[in-house]
Amino acid sequence: MVGGRYGLSSKDTTPGQIIAVYDNLEKDEPKNNFTIGINDDVTFTSLDYKEIELPHPGQISCKLWGLGGDGTVGANKNAISTIGFVGGKYAQAYFSYDTMKSGGLTQSHLRFGDEPILSTYLVSSADFVAVHAPTYVKKYDTTEDLKEGGTFLLNCPWTCLLYTSPSPRDRTR
């Protein structure tokens, strides 16, 4: 019998990590009491994994960065409901919050399309990324999860991206 833990420190479990579990089970001597989702540099029980991008033709995925209390999460809940109920699309939304309620980091992960959505993890490859707190472009890699050819929207008072160096200007056109 082999067992392990996941979801430690509220970390999301990704398809790449699940594949690592199955790869571990196929070994002659699989690692027991393993962990996925964190880098365990104390007991070294983490399984190595490679992130993969699962194709979902016709599905649109979005990741929106907000500031707790700015209305981003509420607006996204309304938007995904409208897309699903009024637009007749399959729709899914996950929301993650910082420990601070007001003023903390919020992330909205939205998916919608014409086929049922079976993804049970956060968006890590987005067609659309929006950032509603201009300071986030220096604090976080807000374009990390943007697909090649995806759309990046920065809600800011600036007229030029020169103020955001090095990110996201270096990854956008």
Set out the residue ranges of the language-model regions.
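Gly/Ser/Thr-rich loops at beta-strand to alpha-helix junctions
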Residues: G7-K11, G66-G74, R173
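Flexible inter-domain linker/hinge segments
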Residues: L8-S61
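Single conserved hydrophobic/aromatic residue that forms the stacking wall/gate
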Residues: Y163-R173
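ADP-ribose/adenylate-binding Rossmann-like module
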Residues: D145-L162
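Short glycine-rich, flexible loops that bind phosphorylated cofactors or substrates
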Residues: V137-K139, C160-L161
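Phosphate/diphosphate-binding loops
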Residues: M1-E29, L122-Y136, T142
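Anionic-ligand anchoring segments at beta-strand to alpha-helix junctions in alpha/beta enzyme folds, i.e.
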Residues: S61-S125
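Fold-independent oxyanion-binding glycine-rich loops
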Residues: G3-R5, L67, G113-E115, H132-T135, ...
